[in-house]
Amino acid sequence: NYSVTYATGTLTVNAKALTVSGVTANNKVYDGLTTSTLNTGTAAFVGVVGADVVTINVASATGTFASANVGTGITVTVAGIAKAGADNANYTITQPTTTANITARGLTVTASNQTKTYGDSALGTSLFTSVGLQNSETIGSVTLTSNSALSTSSNYIVGSSTITPSAAIGGTFTITNYSVTYATGTLTVNAKA
């Protein structure tokens, strides 16, 4: 009863997205940077169909922390994982994410030795040195106190005493990224001529 005409259609086959397993990020000590080192020794694609040949290449894989600051469970975004093999054109790659920790770095703040003459001004807040700051960070000031007794005129007593630093603040550093150790210096007060 019919004269049938058949018309063609189009089949579009999209590449399948592969996920990646076996990639982890190493914890690190704070260095002021977001770069992460990765463990890729067991990296593998998940989702390859049947006997398709698709190999993973992690030679250019990189990891980036979401934040450079100290923290736990910080997201690490992975990039640069590539594919090869006879059937690789049938697939795309979903780059993985993982997490890792950044722990505080040791920072030593040392009071500089000071020599004064009886009647000189106070110790100030800038005579100190530091070891451990990262990425050109700076400390603005440090509280410096002495265990020297004070005379009735509020001048340090002649002799030697300890300068104790504390409360590093300011500058460009963030104190929560460091485990701070304070080391003392020596105050020498000479008699006034």
Regions found by a protein language model. Give the residues of each.
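Short loop/turn motifs that initiate or flank beta-strands
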Residues: 1-193
